[in-house]
Amino acid sequence: MKAKYKPTGKIYEIFNVRDDRNGYPQFLIRRDNEWVYISAKYFVTIEEEV
């Protein structure tokens, strides 16, 4: 799945989804050659055309 990061508009590939301790989703992305979990509230999903 791909999603757009709202603050920068950059598109990232989502590799995993997990919930934090409060139950909110976080996306695992690769940013600057590092794996980072970021809150899903900062992303807008992109519908892939088939």
Predicted region positions:
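Basic/aromatic-rich interaction segments and small domains that mediate binding to polyanionic partners
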Residues: M1-Y42
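Short acidic DE-rich linear segments
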Residues: E47-V50
